[in-house]
Design a protein with these regions (language model features):
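Intrinsic-disorder/low-complexity signal
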Residues: 1-198
Length: 198
């Protein structure tokens, strides 16, 4: 097993690889299939717990454990250059400060560990790109990334071309129509009689 450092890469000896991302806190792990322009082709290339399968990439969640992104490199379409594996914190308002997530790359067929990576010096980040599985000269490699985002998974998804729906702003309470003006009181009614000095 190889312990990777940020920016390091190594060739993959397995056709099917699984990337587990674990931490002392609950993480949401996802995978994005990126074309040569560094963007998804459509929102279908965003693989996560609500959309657990894409072209050659699947998401699975272990009971009580971390999420896994599995990449079958033989089934990834030719137009896809890399699969980015991300992690975001499940707890609203939480950051990675003091949390050390570890990405473990395994052979998905025999479960042997190929590499691991723990991004260093995390702080205000709420989401990060952990590793990427990428195609180079017809072969597949893994690169340790560790790039953090302060705007969560939505920030990562937007950077890679996924359409992210902004949460709807709370609807303003309807305003009551203005009260109709009170009719003018006829002279002499509710006051001194007309022509009487006040």
């Amino acid at each position: 097993m190889t312990a990777m450092t940020p920016g390091s890469n190594l060739p993959l000896s397995a056709v099917r690889v699984a990337v587990d991302v674990t931490a002392p806190v609950r993480l949401d792990v996802s995978g994005l299939l990126l074309a040569a322009d560094g963007k998804v082709r459509s929102d279908d290339d965003f693989v996560f717990y609500n959309q657990p399968a894409g072209s050659g990439v699947t998401h699975s969640a272990a009971a009580g454990g971390g999420d896994t992104i599995t990449v079958d490199t033989a089934a990834v379409p030719d137009g896809i250059e890399k699969i980015v594996v991300t992690a975001s914190l499940d707890q609203p308002g939480a950051t990675f400060a003091g949390t050390e997530p570890t990405g473990t790359v395994r052979n998905a067929d025999d479960n042997s560990v190929l590499a691991s990576f723990t991004p260093p010096q995390l702080g205000a980040e709420t989401a990060l790109v952990v590793v990427e599985i990428y195609r180079r000269s017809g072969a597949w490699k893994v690169r340790a990334v560790g790039q953090g985002y302060a705007n969560g998974l939505a920030g990562i998804a937007t950077d890679f071309g996924v359409s992210v729906e902004e949460p709807a702003a709370p609807a303003a309470a309807p305003q009551a129509p203005p009260a109709p003006p009170a009719p003018a009181a006829p002279a002499g009614q509710w006051g001194p009689p007309a022509g009487t000095p006040a």
